[in-house]
Curated annotation (Swiss-Prot):
Keywords: Ribonucleoprotein, Ribosomal protein, RNA-binding, rRNA-binding. Belongs to the universal ribosomal protein uL22 family. This protein binds specifically to 23S rRNA; its binding is stimulated by other ribosomal proteins, e.g. L4, L17, and L20. It is important during the early stages of 50S assembly. It makes multiple contacts with different domains of the 23S rRNA in the assembled 50S subunit and ribosome. InterPro entries: Ribosomal_uL22, Ribosomal_uL22_bac/chlpt-type, Ribosomal_uL22_bac/org-type, Ribosomal_uL22_CS, Ribosomal_uL22_sf. PROSITE patterns: RIBOSOMAL_L22 (PS00464). GO terms for molecular function: rRNA binding; structural constituent of ribosome. The lineage of its organism: Bacteria, Pseudomonadati, Spirochaetota, Spirochaetia, Leptospirales. HAMAP family: Ribosomal_uL22_B (MF_01331_B). Part of the 50S ribosomal subunit. The keyword Ribonucleoprotein applies. It comes from Leptospira interrogans serogroup Icterohaemorrhagiae serovar Lai (strain 56601). This is Large ribosomal subunit protein uL22. Pfam families: Ribosomal_L22. One of its GO terms (cellular component) is cytosolic large ribosomal subunit. GO terms for biological process: translation.
Length: 110
C-alpha cells in the first residue's frame, strides 16, 4: 500500500530543500522525523508537514496500518514557478531577483 502527499508552491529554493530530502530518503517515518528534528535547516518545516500528511493519508487508506512499518519510498522536490522581483541599483539600473518555489512530493510504503 502506498500513501502520497504533495505540498506545492513552498516558498523555498528547491536546491536547498533537496539537501535535506536526500538525507531522509529510504528511512522509516519515525527515524526520518527524528533526523529532521535535529537538522538545522529551514527546509525541515515543510518536509515534516508533508511526511505527517502522507502518514495521515496512509491511515485513511488502511485503518490497520502499522506506523512503525511505514518508510519513505520516494521523496522528490521539483521546481515551481519563479517570482521575478527587481531591486533598484545605482545609476537608474535594476537587478533582477528570482524567488524560487518548490513542489515537494512524498510517497510512503509499508
Amino acid at each position: 500500500m502506498e500513501a502520497k502527499a504533495v505540498s506545492r508552491f513552498v516558498r523555498m529554493s528547491p536546491r536547498k530543500v533537496r539537501l535535506v530530502a536526500d538525507e531522509i530518503r529510504g528511512y522509516a517515518v519515525n527515524e526520518a522525523l527524528d533526523i529532521l528534528k535535529f537538522t538545522n535547516k529551514r527546509a525541515i518545516e515543510p518536509l515534516t508537514k508533508v511526511i505527517l500528511s502522507a502518514s495521515a493519508n496512509a491511515s485513511v487508506l488502511n485503518n490497520k496500518v502499522d506506523f512503525n512499518q511505514l518508510f519513505i519510498k520516494k521523496i522528490y522536490v521539483d521546481e515551481g514557478p519563479i517570482m521575478k522581483r527587481f531591486r533598484p541599483r545605482a545609476r537608474g539600473r535594476a537587478a533582477r531577483i528570482r524567488k524560487r518555489l518548490s513542489h515537494i512530493t512524498v510517497v510512503l510504503s509499508d
